[in-house]
């Protein structure tokens, strides 16, 4: 007899299984095209990608359709838009798609700003700006590959990230590669290993051919 698991909680949609688009104005309970999630003993963190923000709940909510406790990337739960609705990239997001909490720090793949944002502690206050980033020279910069050629310290549409065996892995989608740092950096630093390309300066589809080692 098949086993059908039921969700413990539902968040975002107005009803379980609801498919309607959220209201035009975002709230602390609504989600629009979420693409990334993280859960540990302290936080539930969701990339609310379509609203260009990160929502955080303190632990697993105790009821359905619960309001988030913290919002990052927007001035309030009612604001939306890339780069905080035009405020600027220093404290704004453009399509966040991946999230990891490691050693008390929050890492977010800010895909269309071509960077990984880092908070040195998981914020418990809304609209807290990130402390630094990987993939750009500063929090004000948003050009793909830092506005120059592909390199070990540049990113183009980083859609996913993970910490595995103490090493940071980033899916650098636009450059058709995976970058790996030997450890988890505490400042902007070049990657140590590349998968899917022959070297750190290449970004061709399938390395220009098709095979097992290609991305």
List the predicted regions and their residue ranges:
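Gly/Pro-rich loop segments of beta-rich domains
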Residues: 2-33, 60-95, 122-157, 184-212
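Juxtadomain low-complexity/linker regions and immediately adjacent membrane-anchoring helices
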Residues: 1-9, 52, 112-114
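Short loop/turn segments immediately following the C-termini of beta-strands
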Residues: 49-50, 59, 111-112, 121, ...
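Structural signal for beta-propeller blades
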Residues: 52-54, 114-116, 176-178
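Short coil/turn segments that connect the beta-strands within blades of beta-propeller domains
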Residues: 42, 103-104, 165-166
């Amino acid at each position: 007899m098949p086993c059908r698991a039921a969700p413990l909680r539902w968040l975002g949609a107005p009803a379980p299984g609801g498919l309607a688009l959220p209201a035009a104005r975002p709230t602390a309970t609504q989600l629009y095209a979420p693409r990334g999630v993280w859960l540990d003993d302290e936080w539930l963190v969701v990339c609310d990608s379509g609203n260009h923000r990160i929502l955080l709940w303190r632990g697993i909510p105790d009821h359905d359709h619960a309001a988030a406790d913290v919002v990052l990337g927007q001035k309030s739960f009612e604001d939306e838009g890339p780069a905080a609705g035009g405020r600027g990239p220093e404290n704004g997001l453009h399509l966040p798609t991946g999230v990891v909490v490691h050693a008390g720090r929050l890492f977010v793949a800010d895909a269309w700003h071509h960077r990984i944002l880092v908070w040195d502690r998981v914020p418990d206050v809304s609209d807290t700006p990130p402390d630094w980033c990987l993939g750009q020279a500063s929090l004000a910069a948003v050009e793909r590959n830092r506005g120059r050629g592909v390199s070990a310290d540049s990113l183009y549409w980083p859609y996913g990230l993970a910490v595995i065996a103490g090493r940071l892995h980033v899916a650098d989608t636009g450059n058709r590669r995976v970058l790996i740092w030997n450890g988890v950096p505490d400042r902007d630093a070049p990657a140590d290993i590349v998968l899917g390309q022959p070297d750190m300066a290449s970004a061709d589809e399938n390395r220009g051919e098709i095979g097992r080692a290609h991305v």
